[in-house]
């Protein structure tokens, strides 16, 4: 596995890992707070190595081994990171594989580079999650804290409380997708566990309805998390 760093175009280095092979190249887009050392990323890399298929893993700014600060991140910045990695480190047709927030980032990247899309895979994809799963679930007092302080720390089952910034919420509103048709023509596969405690499985059904392409399939795993 080749490793390196690439500038995201805004002065921040992004860490990446890449494996050469046959196309299309798979690009993994991690979730909020996750990185390329996670289980899904490493499993995908192992599968690609076994199949002799090209794959690119990378960390968003403020995540994993990349530079930057997590609380400076927004959906727009992380989508720009994804495009910097895709444009600078891949060539030819792509299959984007997005997990949770990575599904949203991946959709934004796919819409920005439609001519390169050979396919899109969403794993519990969470487009618009800053609004639908964060802002709309906040209590009035939590919203007031966020507006006043610019950051709200919410409990996380995975470790330390997660900082949610006002900038993340406000920027997310500039990139919402689920309120209109999503013009993505490539084949799409949406995988979702019905026991997912973070992203409701119905999200994938709604996303499938919004996608305008004809080749869209949703796979639900009844006991999957």
Residue ranges and their predicted role:
Residues 1-20:
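N-terminal cap/lid segment of alpha/beta-hydrolase-fold proteins
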Residues 32-45, 202:
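The serine-hydrolase catalytic nucleophile loop
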Residues 98-106:
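Gly/Ala-rich beta-loop-alpha elbow adjacent to hydrolase catalytic centers
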Residues 95, 116-221, 225:
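The alpha/beta-hydrolase serine catalytic core
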Residues 64-89:
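Catalytic nucleophile-loop/oxyanion-hole region of alpha/beta-hydrolase
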Residues 43-67:
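Conserved alpha/beta-hydrolase
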Residues 23-31:
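Short beta-strand element of the alpha/beta-hydrolase
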Residues 33, 60-65, 127, 225:
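Alpha/beta-hydrolase active-site loop signature
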């Amino acid at each position: 596995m080749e490793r390196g760093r690439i500038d995201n175009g805004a002065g921040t280095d992004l860490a990446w890992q890449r494996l050469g092979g046959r196309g299309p190249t798979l690009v993994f887009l991690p979730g909020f707070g996750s990185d390329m050392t996670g289980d899904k990323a490493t499993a995908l890399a192992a599968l690609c190595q076994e199949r002799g298929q090209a794959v690119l893993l990378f960390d968003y700014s403020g995540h994993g081994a990349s530079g930057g600060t997590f609380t400076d991140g927004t959906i727009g910045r992380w989508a720009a990171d994804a495009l910097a990695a895709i444009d600078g480190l891949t060539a030819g047709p792509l299959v984007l594989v997005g997990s949770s927030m990575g599904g949203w980032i991946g959709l934004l990247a796919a819409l920005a580079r439609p001519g390169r899309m050979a396919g899109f895979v969403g794993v519990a994809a969470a487009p618009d999650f800053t609004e639908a799963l964060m802002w709309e679930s906040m209590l009035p007092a939590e919203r007031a804290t966020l507006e006043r302080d610019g950051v709200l720390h919410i409990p996380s089952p995975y470790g330390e409380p997660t900082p949610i910034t006002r900038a993340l919420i406000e920027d997310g509103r500039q990139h919402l997708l689920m309120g209109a048709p999503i013009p993505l023509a490539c084949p799409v596969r949406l995988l979702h566990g019905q026991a997912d405690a973070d992203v409701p499985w119905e999200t994938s059904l709604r996303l499938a309805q919004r996608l305008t392409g004809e080749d869209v399939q949703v796979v639900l795993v009844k006991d999957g998390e």
